[in-house]
Curated annotation (Swiss-Prot):
SMART domains: ZnF_C2H2
Top-level taxon: Eukaryota
InterPro entries reported in the protein's UniProt record: Znf_C2H2_sf, Znf_C2H2_type
Zn finger spans (C2H2-type): 225-249, 255-279, 285-307, 313-338
Compositional bias annotation for Basic and acidic residues: 397-416
Gene3D superfamilies membership: Classic Zinc Finger (3.30.160.60)
Principal location class: nucleus
Gene name in the database record: azf1
Composition-biased stretches (Low complexity): 127-139
Keyword Nucleus set for record: yes
Name this polypeptide is given: Transcription factor azf1
Length: 447
């Protein structure tokens, strides 16, 4: 076995000599214990934080001699001839219990609020700032991989979405009785309450338990089939609806479009049938006033608003007062013409704490956005770029005045129809095909 050569570590305040590990000549030496040839346990000892500063091996390393077996500087890292112990680390009763990650379960978007992960994200960023440079680089690489893997998904990050995240975060913090659940991936078996010490457990509500007492479904049936996954507890009147809901957790999409060069997958058969109408051009639903036909029943309901000359969505920012027939058009208008006002409101609302006085105008805007975009975490889509499923046909010159806008099928259908028991994003109806309220045609001004 080769001898070790001293190298110097330059620590602030003092320089200590350390022994650099060298490559071992014998092939029978375990990789986990490079300094020992005697038999040791086949496990890695857990790291226990000592009272001395990190990387401090003691002054004895300055006298680099060749007797490594009983070197006091490595007693916290390698123990020779130790008897086999319990793989679980021994801890004092005063120490907090160890945190163990539960299996990675994909959360159902209809049962979990994404805004609730912001506090945990801040804690993770603070902890990452104290990591060594090597750990930071590795975490950055993992973040880049995660970002690239989710680059195909539609992200809603407009000014309205950012404002709604701030409002929903404050609303959940100030109203613990109706607080949304934290994401399933970040739940840990920490203390007695199942949460890590840095995250306080929300107040238990009837919706947070597995066996819940919820109101009957719209059909009047009792919701007796409940989701058994941790911290979900949604219940349904039919077992089929529960099976569909479970696919939102697992990500299973058993229904595949058989159209050549398509192959998109869906979690519900109804979503597949709706998607197939885009290939076939079938439009089974018609307006009883003008006989205009649509592929989805919900689009007929949105279209009828144009016959009623009703514009129920009004912009209250900057005393605008402009009215719109569809919520998506109002959102696009606010993002385009009131971006500065939205940013100012986001800054103001994010700094609001419980007990602070809020002016009547700010309170009105708070309630206005909280009610108008209450389902924005599911994706209220406005008129934006790159939102079409296929290029617009240019054979008809008159088609520029009226353009057909269709959503991306796989991602938007997943957000729009998380489960049968969920509500629609626009009108509170069912998320099935008959009650889809997706805007189908959008008027465009000729330039």
């Amino acid at each position: 076995m080769e001898t070790a050569e001293p190298v110097s570590y330059e620590f602030p305040g003092h320089a200590v000599g350390a022994v650099a590990p060298r490559r071992m000549m014998g092939s029978n030496v375990g990789h986990n214990f490079p300094f020992y040839t005697n038999p040791t346990g086949g496990y890695t000892l857990p790291f226990h934080q000592s009272s001395s500063p990190a990387y401090s091996f003691g002054h004895t390393l300055n006298h680099h001699h060749h007797h490594h077996h009983h070197h006091p500087g490595y007693q916290h890292y390698f123990v020779a001839g130790q008897q086999p112990i319990n793989p679980q680390p021994v801890r004092l009763s005063s120490e907090p219990p160890s945190i163990q990650q539960i299996p990675d379960i994909r959360p159902a978007k209809n049962a979990v609020n994404r805004v609730a992960r912001d506090p945990l994200m801040k804690i993770e960023h603070n902890g990452a700032s104290q990591q060594p440079p090597g750990a930071q680089s590795s975490s950055n690489e993992e973040g880049a991989q995660g970002k690239s893997s989710s680059s195909n998904e539609v992200e809603f990050s407009t000014e309205v979405d950012i404002l709604m995240k701030a409002i929903q975060a404050k609303a959940s913090a100030q109203s613990p009785g109706v607080q949304s659940l934290p994401p399933l991936q970040q739940l840990t078996h920490g203390g007695s309450n199942g949460y890590p010490q840095s995250y306080s457990m929300p107040v238990t509500t009837p919706r947070c338990t597995v066996m819940v007492e919820e109101a009957p479904s719209r059909s009047g049936k009792k919701r007796k089939y409940a989701c058994t996954l941790p911290q979900c507890g949604k219940s349904f009147a039919q077992k089929t609806h529960l099976d569909i809901h479970m696919r939102a957790h697992t990500g299973d999409k058993p229904f595949v479009c058989k159209e050549p060069s398509c192959g998109q997958r869906f979690s519900q058969l109804g979503n597949l049938k709706t998607h197939q109408r885009r290939h076939t051009g079938e439009k089974p639903f018609s307006c009883d006033i003008c006989q205009k036909r649509f592929a989805q029943r919900g689009n007929v309901r949105a279209h009828k608003i144009t016959h009623q000359h009703a514009k129920p969505f009004t912009c209250l920012l900057d005393d605008c007062g402009k009215q719109f027939t569809q919520l998506g058009n109002l959102k696009s208008h606010q993002n385009k013409f009131h971006a500065t006002t939205l940013r100012n409101l986001t800054m103001k609302f994010s700094q609001v704490t419980e007990g602070d006085h809020m002016s009547p105008q700010d309170r009105k805007l708070w309630e206005y956005f909280a009610t108008l975009y209450k389902n924005s975490n599911k994706g209220i889509k406005g008129r934006g770029k790159d939102r079409r499923i296929s290029p617009t046909s240019r054979s008809d010159p008159g088609s520029e005045s009226r353009r057909r806008i269709e959503p991306l099928s796989s991602t938007d259908d997943k957000m729009r129809r998380a489960s049968y028991g969920d509500t629609s994003m626009y009108n509170g109806g069912s998320s099935s095909d008959d009650d889809d309220a997706e805007p189908y045609f959008i008027e465009r001004q000729a330039h």
